[in-house]
């Protein structure tokens, strides 16, 4: 009698362990697939942003060091007015294939060009708009957390 109870317990434990490993394997496979999809979308976004720089005539360069900045846009200022006609964007080499820093700097370009706004908030707003114009709905869902984090669109907790 005890042997049957013990055997039943062992079988139940083995089934639970096998189920756990199957679920873990399947989740890892899904996560890996999602990472591949996200990487593909980020590469496409980066390529689109670089193409936009070329179309707008913005010189884009990569550097090993930029002080404490991940990227920056260089533009002219005269009598309190900002000019981005000959703007240059500089990005750290380690962010060369990552879209968010480039999008932020292009956001500065757009905010200055449209509203004479050189603020970080203005750049983030424009960068978010720009990325959402480039990405389709599914791609936006895939990068939703990244877009919110990089462009400071987080809800304020009270």
Give the ranges of each region predicted by the language model:
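Active-site scaffold of zinc-dependent metalloenzymes
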Residues: 58-96, 106-109
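Long, well-structured alpha-helical subdomains associated
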Residues: 94, 134-158
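Catalytic Zn2+-binding segment of zinc metalloproteases
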Residues: 106-122, 133-135
């Amino acid at each position: 009698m005890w042997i049957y109870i013990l055997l039943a317990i062992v079988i139940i434990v083995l089934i639970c362990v096998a189920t756990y490993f199957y679920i873990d394997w399947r989740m890892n496979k899904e996560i890996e697939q999602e990472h591949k999809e996200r990487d593909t979308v980020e590469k496409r976004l980066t390529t689109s942003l670089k193409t936009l720089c070329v179309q707008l005539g913005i010189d884009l360069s990569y550097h090993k060091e930029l002080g404490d900045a991940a990227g920056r846009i260089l533009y002219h200022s005269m009598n309190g007015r900002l000019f981005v006609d000959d703007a240059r964007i500089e990005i750290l080499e380690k962010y060369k294939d990552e879209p968010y820093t480039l999008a932020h700097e292009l956001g500065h370009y757009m905010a200055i060009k449209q509203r004479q706004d050189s603020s970080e908030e203005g750049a983030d707003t424009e960068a978010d708009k720009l990325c959402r114009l480039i990405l389709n709905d599914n791609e936006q869902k895939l990068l939703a957390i990244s877009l919110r984090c990089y462009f400071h669109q987080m809800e304020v907790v009270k």
